[in-house]
Structures are given as C-alpha cells and as structure tokens.
C-alpha cells in the first residue's frame, strides 16, 4: 500500500488494475546474452510488438502527407540483397509483414516503404554494410527501438533500415567506477536491471525504457526523468564507437571520466539522430544506486503553486531531489480513461511528482517530511501521497510515464516538446485551448518542470491539415518569442526539421550543413531528417 | 581554529603564516563593472602580475627549445596596427614591457615574440579584428588569464595576441534557475563571488581561479575541484557565443537547460583551445549554494588506504561528497618549503582532502562523522582534522590548491596530467622515482582522485633535454598501455600536441584535422597548437 504521509492526506486505495507494470510496452525479451537470456528464443521483431502499432487503420505514407521529394539515391537491387546476405547471413529481412512495423513510427504518424531491414550483430558488420551502401549510393535509416517522437526512426521512402536490435551485448562493467560499456542496441531497461544488480543505476530513465536502445538514446540526446539530477548525456557518455557513412569505424570508446586530448568528437554524434554516423557502442558512467528512494505525488490548486512547490523542493531537498515532474488534470483524465489508472489523490488542476534519491533513508525522509508539511500548511499542495517501497514508487511513476501512451490511444497526436522559461511554461497550453476550441479533442501539458521542459500535446480524432495550420507555426513562433527551444529533448527528425530556424540562427544552420557534408558527403545517412532541405 | 574532530586527532596549531589567502595569485582587481569595480583604476596588465612570472632569468624562446617552423603567415605591419587602432582605439598594446608577460606562459616554459596585444571589449570588436586578420593572413593567439599548463595560451612566434581581459561584463543572471550569462573574460573568482552573493556557486573551481577567465576555462574544458560533484562543462555550459576565424559571429548563447534543435555546435568549441574560434560569451548553469560545507583533511598510511578511503566516502557520503583530492608527502613538503604552509596533521605518506556540500548541516555532519569514525577505526586514516567555517575550509583547501604554485617555485617543472585506472594511479610515480633517480629534484603525485586524474610532476634545477628524454615518451607509452589519457584536463596546447596519438586513433586525428580545416581554413587561429603538424 502507498503510505499516506499525514492523516489529512488521501487514503483511498490507489490502483484499479493491480497487475500492471511500470513499463507499458509489451517489452520483448531481447537477446542480451550476458544479461541472462539465451539468444535463440526471440522472434526477430518481437521488440517492436507494441499494441499501439499493431492493428488499426493503415498509416498514410509519409510523402503523401508531407511535401517531400525522393532524392536520387539508388534502389536496392537483387545484387545488393545478395551482398548484404554475404555480410550478415540470415539477418537480411525482406518479408513485408516483418517490415511493416519498422516502417511505421511509434506514434503512427509517418510511414516509409523500405523493402529491406538489416540486423547486424557487430560493428564490423555495420561497417561492411555502410561501405557497400556508400559505394552504391543507397540511403540508410539507422533504427534503434523505434520509439522516437519526431519521425526520425523510420524511412521516409525506401531507405535501407539498419537496426541495432541484435547489437545487444554488454562489453564491460567496472563495479568500482560504475562505467558501463555496451553495444548500441542494448535496451535501456535491460541495462538498468543489469547495473542495478551491481548497485548502480543508469544515469537516464524514460517512459520508453522497455523498448528504446541506448544507441537511440544517445543519437537523440534523450533527456528523460533523471536529467534534473544526473544531467545530460553530454556529461555522462564517456565514449562512443561510431561507424561513419563510408564504413570507417571511429573508435572513441574510452572509459575515462576526463580526457582532453584534442576535440571531443563523440559530441558531434550525440544528438545527431543518425545523420552523421551509426553509433555502435557506448561507454557511459552510472551513478551509485541510491540507498533510499521516496516519491511523493501531490495535487496543486494552480500552476503558480506548482512553481512554488518546485522552488520549495529545490531549496529544502537540495542534493537529494532527483525528479520534479508535473501534469495537468487532463493528463490524469486520459491515463484514467485509456489505461485505467486511478488518481491516488483528490482531483486537482495540477499534479506533481517529486522524487528523492539519497544515501540515508532517515535523513531523506526527514527532509521530505519537512517539505511536505511546509507545502501543505502553506496551501501550495492540497492533497498528496507518498511511497518508498519499489512497487508503489513504480505505481506513482506510471501516472506520469504512461501519459504518452494514453495520448496515443486518444487519437492523432500533435506533439510539441518545448523548452520555455519556467514561469511561462503553462501559458501556452491555456492559450491554445482558447485558440483551438472544439477543433481539438484534448490540449494537455505535462513534462520535466525541473528542466523547463513542457510536453504540449493536442489530440484529435484524426490528422487534420486545418488543425495543423492552427498549431503551426503558431506554437513555434510563440516559443521563439520566449527564446525557448522548439525541441527540448525529442530532436528534429523528419517532422521538425524545417523549424530549426526558430531556435537557431542562420549561421548555425549553415555550420550544421557543413558538418553534415564533411561527415556524410553523399548524404546517405538518414536523409530528409534533422536539417532543413538545402535550397 | 580548525576543529579537531575527535580527541586522538592532531590538535597542533595549523598555520605558520596567518595572513595568507585561498587564492595565491596576486589577483588583480579586473574591471568587472557590474561586479562593483570601476574600470578606470586598473593598469592594463595587472591581471598577469604573478610573482612567479616577474623577475628570474629570461625564458628561452619557444622555437629555440622546440623543433617548430614558423608558417607563412603575414607579419603585423604599420597598416595593420592602424586598422586595429581604428577598431579598438587605445587598446592596441605594442609596448615591449607590457607584451613581455603575455608572451610567456604561467609555468615560464615557453615564450613567443608577439609584437601586439589587442584588448577588445565586445564581440563585435573581436569580429572586426578577426575579419581583418583573416583577410591579411595574420595568425592569432586567443588569450584568457594565461594560466594554461600546456603552452597554448601564448604565441609560439609573432602571433597577434587577442586578450579577453576587458570582456568582463556579466550579461545576465537568473536568480531562480541560476543561469549566468557573461562575457568570456570574466575572472572565475569574480564570478564565484557574484553568484555566491545570490546564493549559487559556480559549477567549477580551480586553483587558478583568481586569474583564469571563464572563456579560458571553456576553451580548455577545465575540470578542477568540483568536477566530481557537478560534472563536466559539457553538461553545465548551456550556450556560447563564438567568433569564427573569418569574423563571423556564431550566436549559440541560449540559456536553456535542454535544446535538441540540430547539432550542438557549442560542443565543438568547448575544449578546442582557441583553435576553432574565439569564445566571446558563455551561458552556464550554477548549482544552488550548499547550505553546509565540511572539509576533512586526512593522513593515510599508503595508497591502498587512500583508495579504500575514497570508496568508503563515496559509499557513505553519497550525494553530498563534493571533492576527493589526494597529494603525497612530497607535495606537502613543497608547500611547506616554498609557501610556508603548515601540515595540519601528522606526517603521512599520503593526504586526502574530502569535501561535503549539502543542504542540511546536521545531516551532513552526521554522515561525515560516521565516515571518519569508520576510516579511523579501520586504520585507513591515521590522523585528520576537520573544518566547517569558511576561513578554515579555505586554509585546508590551500594545501591542495597551491601545490602547482609550490612546484613552480621548486625549479623547472615537467608536468603530466593523466587519466589512469584509479587502482594504478600512483604506480607511475613510484616507477619514475626509480627510473629518474637523482636526475630529478622531486617526483610528486597529486590530483583529482575521484575522477581518476593524476597530476604527475617532476622538478629539476633547469630544463634538461636528457631528463625530458627519460620522461618522454616513457610516460605517454605507460599511460597508453593502461588505456589512459595523456591529457585529462589541461588539453594539448603547444607542448602536448604531438602526443595526441597516444590517446586517439588515426581516424580520430584525421577527423579533427578536417574539423579544423572546416572552421579555420587558413589555420590562423592558434596555429602550432592542439593538433599535430600535418605531414
Ligand atoms: C513513451 C515514450 C516516452 C518517452 N520519453 C522520453 C523522455 O522522457 N525524454 C526523451 O528525451 N525522449 C523520450 N522519448 C523519445 C525518445 O527519443 C526515445 O524514446 C529514445 O531516446 C529513442 O531511442 P530509440 O532506440 O527508440 O531510437 P529510435 O526511435 O529508433 O531512433 C531515434 C533516432 O535516433 C536514430 N538512431 C537510433 N539508433 C541509432 C544508432 N545506433 N546510431 C545512430 N542513430 C541512431 C534514428 O535514426 C532516429 O533518428 C519517449 C518516447 C516514448 C515512446
Ligand atoms: C594554479 C593552477 C591550477 C590549475 N588547476 C586546474 C585544474 O584543477 N583543472 C584544470 O582543468 N586546469 C587547471 N589549470 C589549468 C587550466 O587550463 C587553466 O587554469 C584555465 O582553464 C585556463 O584559463 P585561462 O583563462 O587562464 O586560459 P589561457 O591560459 O589564457 O588559455 C588556455 C587556452 O585556451 C585558449 N583560450 C583562452 N581564452 C579563450 C577564448 N576566449 N576563446 C578561445 N580560446 C581561448 C588559449 O588560446 C589557450 O589555448 C590550473 C592552472 C593553474 C595555474
């Protein structure tokens, strides 16, 4: 049972559906040999078996919805297939049914028509594949767990899909320093489990953990739920191995916390969304597993109170504050309606989830109790509940983590992932509700408040050009006016590549294009993604 | 007085010279207008007035000691000087005496013969200067506080010195988020004071704080004393403004914690040591000022005990551990001999400095006391002392921070800054003592143990080619064998540029050269630095 903290708090029983798990996806048992699963038993595409993808109406082909022209790449020929088969025998997939899931993104908003999926196991194989594609001028779409939010993870036309799903080996783990070196296709949740057994945790965590790959996380510079405490992958990733467009293997897979020998090349690939190279292995430093974790789930009467609660937490919890997430009442309704999760506290306009992670259960509980007393007594919080044991902690987290899933069940989702000055974070949501009126089914706001990161989502029965027109460029212009970012953590992928200019000046865009030309002169890696098409 | 923690600890009076300050340099009062000092009163080069530089024998000209050829850049003409005078009237320095200090590095190991020092105040001025130099093919040496350790901060021949000393304005500070935006020439210690008054701290700290500039810190990707807790500048620097070789201003000066719009260009400039662009402004996130800081200074009987003490601290102090530094007994002798600092504890083979920073004085003291009891009782530590008030904390820190200064007073210093597996960190010091015998005056080891970072220093009466031959490439090969880094935090600059290959594979070096060619096609920015000369 979730422990009510003080008597006036809600003591209702929390969970309607008792058997659910923290990770919503039907997580596949991916063949992490050293993580204890024998490889033979997995069906090749099990890791993509989301219920939200399977079934439902066919997703519109990307070029039918978006104005995009195929670039003059070659088309995969029988000879190409034979060459691939030589490099990775038995792992060249051309079966249309198996290809279907890899051609469609998690949100079911874009669809490519690739005819071939390649499943290498080693960097050497990736290198040989790219060498071949480079020579043959074949476009390539690197794919991890395919949980990306911006249409970057699937082909736009017939690009070869290069999946890291079978590159799922832990290479080494140092149990004093906590430095993990692994292949790019390791599933984040598997890695989490692996390092937790050794008394460490992964420095990042996100709702997609059951499916996303560490390589995909690095390629998107994923933020997620622990960013507030453990910072960006730019600090925690120590090394990368990357295969360049022409097949050259760039080995920067060092396991050193500090290394200032020359330019830090790995940084170019972090967040480059598969457009500059294919990440094949990652070295990452894991923080020690905290001895005590507490989660409080609180109801706030207004957004001003959410902000004030954050300030109070930051001031009083200091170094043990490990997450501060918020969601509005519409989010709560959606997780209730679509996923049958029950609100553990009184209905409120806003909810926040506060997590502490520390090295002394007693000290942490004392700090958190002081905070909770203060926010309750001052009226910043009207109701709340707290959990310390792992199962209950996960239950509370699910309310926040499964919002993305609930939204995707609500209809077509227009997704915006913005960095904004924290004081103005919620204004845009209110503004849009008025602007869109009944044209939108739901306009919701939630996200990583502690990082100034708003997930603004608008759902509708179906994709609608008119609704899109009401949203864009309005949302981007609004954000730019606040000097915010039009993509805080999801990247630009296919769907946001043309809005780069709202957050970056022309000089920067030109430099990015030069960098792309330097590393991928033929432009075969994830074309139509990240950078606006050149004039 | 420094409080003895438990009765068996040393209670001797600590400090021979009562009047000393934490920062050893004769720190200049640099004209940070908004930081409270009127600009008019400073002599132009006051910030370089180190006693260790002034006086003493003339430093050998770099090309006389090192095999390096001047590249075919133009020579500064009267017309160039007139053009500079037009851009920055009154701030073009050609007086040989004033130029002397800017031509010699802090360690007095390299000397250039530049005839002109430029002191712009704005990015626009930097842009105009570089536009002129680019057109005229004049080589440029960006210079911050000139505290660099690898000869990167001074000209090798007659490069134009472009100093950020007058670019010392705070642009903005947000007192909720702690995000500071400032010009590149702000002195780290001034910034520290500025943000501390607002209840934040800088995420980095180093012994050179009284002189080094934030731009120089970013240009060298400085690590320093808070790296263990607050991580790398790659995570804490949020934005940069950079002037490119041709004078183009690249404005990536965002103040957002998260921004995944396109490639993160600022990363290319962090740690690029002035070879890819001139950093003119920095946006950096400052952590809240901890409410309680404790420092313990401990004596350990051996290096194995140092390591075990570290593990104990990490395990028991967890999130409040903010520094773990070590030094050997020779270091202590040198700070005693050259700086008259007194050892606060019993003489020991090794000393460690443990710092905690947290949000509850009571909780932190309790945690630290538990640790200290444990390490004393188990014999890992034989003597120690602890401090909580700021003055005493600074006194203990000085023992560690002033080692660099003590070494520079001991004679010519051969400096190595290595990342090594922590278990083998001290082996190389022992090995070298045997190898060098009486040829070396002192062979000492100290550094950021918590980050696996050893500062290995060898002193001699004077520079000696023979001693150099005994040290190099031996030290680099030894490090490479351990898969370490031949420059953990100091960068490569002029003196280490040719050893890049010990830590990076040829593919990486080639890519770095391409990056340099892309951003600085004429190679005018800090030539002869960071990258090995191309064949
Ligand atoms: C429920 C849910 C919650 C989420 N929560 C968060 C969150 O909190 N924070 C956040 O930042 N993101 C979040 N995301 C989106 C996030 O981008 C992804 O979940 C994750 O980082 C992508 O990993 P992936 O392996 O699925 O990559 P994919 O989706 O397969 O690919 C993403 C991009 O990276 C490229 N890529 C993938 N692997 C490689 C590789 N090895 N080398 C080069 N390029 C590669 C692809 O080409 C594509 O452009 C969430 C997504 C979902 C579905
Ligand atoms: C006593 C002492 C202690 C030190 N401790 C540490 C430590 O703990 N950790 C650590 O990492 N380092 C340490 N250092 C070395 C460290 O590199 C410097 O102190 C500091 O980061 C350099 O800053 P600076 O402003 O003095 O730069 P400079 O020495 O002036 O320049 C260093 C390099 O950066 C370039 N540069 C400077 N400013 C700019 C700019 N605005 N744009 C582009 N390029 C620029 C220069 O061309 C040069 O290549 C120490 C040095 C001393 C003397």
Swiss-Prot record, chains A, B:
Signal peptide: none annotated. Its EC number is 1.1.99.39. PROSITE patterns: FAD_PCMH. The modification N6-succinyllysine is found at residue 115. Its cofactor is FAD. Activated by zinc and cobalt ions. It is found in: Mitochondrion. One of its GO terms (molecular function) is zinc ion binding. GO terms for cellular component: mitochondrion. Zn(2+) binds at residues 448, 455, 489. InterPro entries: FAD-bd_oxidored_4_C, FAD-bd_PCMH, FAD-bd_PCMH-like_sf, FAD-bd_PCMH_sub1, FAD-bd_PCMH_sub2, FAD-linked_Oxase-like_C, FAD-oxidored/transferase_4, Oxid_FAD_bind_N. Residues 110-289 form the FAD-binding PCMH-type domain. It comes from the Eukaryota. Residues 1-50 form a transit peptide. GO terms for biological process: lactate metabolic process; malate metabolic process; response to cobalt ion; response to manganese ion; response to zinc ion; tartrate metabolic process. (R)-2-hydroxyglutarate binds at residues 400, 404, 415, 457, 490. (R)-malate binds at residues 400, 404, 415, 490. It holds the Pfam family FAD_binding_4. Belongs to the FAD-binding oxidoreductase/transferase type 4 family. PANTHER family: D-2-HYDROXYGLUTARATE DEHYDROGENASE, MITOCHONDRIAL. This is D-2-hydroxyglutarate dehydrogenase, mitochondrial. The lineage of its organism: Eukaryota, Metazoa, Chordata, Craniata, Vertebrata.
């Amino acid at each position: 049972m979730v422990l009510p903290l003080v008597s006036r708090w809600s003591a209702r029983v929390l969970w309607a559906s008792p058997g659910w798990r923290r990770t919503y996806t039907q997580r596949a048992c991916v063949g992490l040999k050293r993580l204890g699963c024998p490889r033979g038993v997995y069906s090749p595409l099990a890791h993509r078996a989301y219920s939200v993808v399977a079934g439902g109406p066919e997703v519109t082909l990307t070029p039918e919805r978006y104005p995009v022209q195929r670039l003059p790449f070659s088309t995969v020929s029988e000879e190409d297939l034979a060459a691939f088969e030589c490099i990775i025998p038995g792992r060249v997939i051309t079966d249309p049914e198996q290809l279907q899931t890899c051609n469609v993104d998690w949100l079911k908003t874009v669809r490519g028509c690739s005819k071939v999926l390649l499943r290498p196991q080693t960097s050497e194989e990736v290198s040989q594949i790219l060498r071949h594609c480079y020579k043959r001028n074949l476009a390539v779409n690197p794919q991890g767990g395919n949980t990306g939010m911006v249409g970057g993870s699937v082909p736009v036309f017939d690009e070869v899909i290069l999946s890291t799903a079978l590159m799922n080996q832990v290479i080494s783990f140092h149990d004093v320093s906590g430095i993990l070196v692994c292949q790019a296709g390791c599933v984040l949740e598997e890695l989490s489990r692996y390092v937790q057994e050794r008394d460490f945790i992964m420095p990042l965590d996100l709702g997609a953990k059951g499916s996303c790959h560490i390589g995909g996380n690095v390629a998107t510079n994923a933020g997620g739920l622990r960013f507030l405490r453990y910072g960006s992958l730019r600090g925690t990733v120590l090394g990368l191995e990357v295969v360049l467009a022409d097949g050259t293997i760039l080995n920067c897979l060092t396991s050193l916390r500090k290394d200032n020998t020359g330019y830090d090349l790995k940084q170019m690939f972090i967040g480059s969304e598969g457009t500059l190279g294919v990440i094949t292995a990652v070295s990452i430093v894991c923080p020690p597993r905290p001895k005590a974790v507490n989660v409080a789930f609180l109801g706030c009467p207004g957004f001003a109170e959410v902000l004030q609660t954050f300030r109070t937490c930051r001031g009083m919890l200091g170094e043990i504050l490990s997450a501060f997430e918020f969601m509005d009442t519409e989010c709560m309704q959606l997780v209730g309606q679509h996923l049958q999760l029950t609100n553990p506290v009184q209905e409120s306009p806003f909810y926040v989830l506060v997590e502490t992670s520390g090295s002394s259960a007693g000290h942490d509980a004392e700090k958190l109790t002081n905070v909770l007393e203060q926010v309750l007594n001052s009226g910043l919080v009207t109701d709340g509940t707290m959990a310390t044991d792992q199962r209950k902690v996960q239950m509370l987290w699910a309310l926040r983590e499964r919002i993305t899933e609930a939204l995707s069940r609500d209809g077509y989702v227009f997704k915006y992932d913005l960095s904004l000055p924290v004081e103005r974070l919620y204004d845009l949501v209110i503004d849009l509700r008025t602007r869109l009126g009944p044209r939108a089914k739901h306009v919701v706001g939630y996200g990583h408040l502690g990082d100034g990161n708003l997930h603004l989502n608008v759902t509708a029965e179906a994709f609608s050009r008119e609704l899109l027109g009401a949203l864009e460029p309005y949302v981007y212009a609004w954000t730019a006016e606040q000097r915010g970012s039009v993509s805080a953590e999801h990247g630009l992928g296919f769907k946001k590549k043309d809005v780069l200019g709202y957050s970056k000046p022309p000089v920067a865009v030109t430099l990015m294009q030069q960098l792309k030309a330097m590393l991928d002169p033929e432009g075969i890696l994830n074309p139509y993604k990240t950078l606006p098409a050149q004039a």
